[in-house]
Amino acid sequence: KSAFITGGAKRIGQDMALHLAKKGWDIGLHYRNSLNEAESTRKRIEEYGSLCKLFCADLGKPQAAVDMIKQVLIEFPKLDLMVHNASVFDVSPFATVNVEVFDRQFDVNFKSPFFMTQHYINNCSKGHVVNILDTKIQSNQATHFTAYNLSKKALMHLTKMTALDLAPGFRVNGIAPGPVLKASHGTEDE
């Protein structure tokens, strides 16, 4: 089996990649700026006996995301799982959101997953898509993250729509974790 994970070099994306590799999955790992972390993760994946290919792209440019998924499908033509984990999270209260922040949030958090999934389903006969959401979008708790919340709400609605539209060939799910990043001064256990 094979999986492709955006934002797979660090944190939750890395944990998903390592978990799947332990189970024998081959991994396509996306990163943007974290080459050292991506190479380290690749080495760890290969220690489990799984294949790992690295893919670099700025998901803030949706066409670059589509070009990347084309390369992923060359390496993994029968891709079983695509995980849209990469996201940007900018402080942006409604009164201060500018076009640049708004576009970046939607390009990375919504448009790139949209068009990558579209390319995936048009080039594979079956598979699984997992969109990483955020628990904050259910209750509107994070009012200082207007553009982020809107982009994740759009991704949540896309998840629901595609789960219906693409079944039974493709299973589409969303996972909405709570806070997962450790404090820069904290330990892994904290």
Please report, for each region that a protein language model flagged, where it lies by residue.
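The beta1-alpha1 cofactor-binding region of Rossmann-like NAD(H)/NADP(H)-dependent oxidoreductases
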Residues: 35, 56-67, 99
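Conserved NAD(P)H cofactor-binding loop of Rossmann-fold oxidoreductase domains
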Residues: 85-90
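Substrate-binding pocket helix/loop in short-chain dehydrogenase/reductase
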Residues: 93-94, 101-106
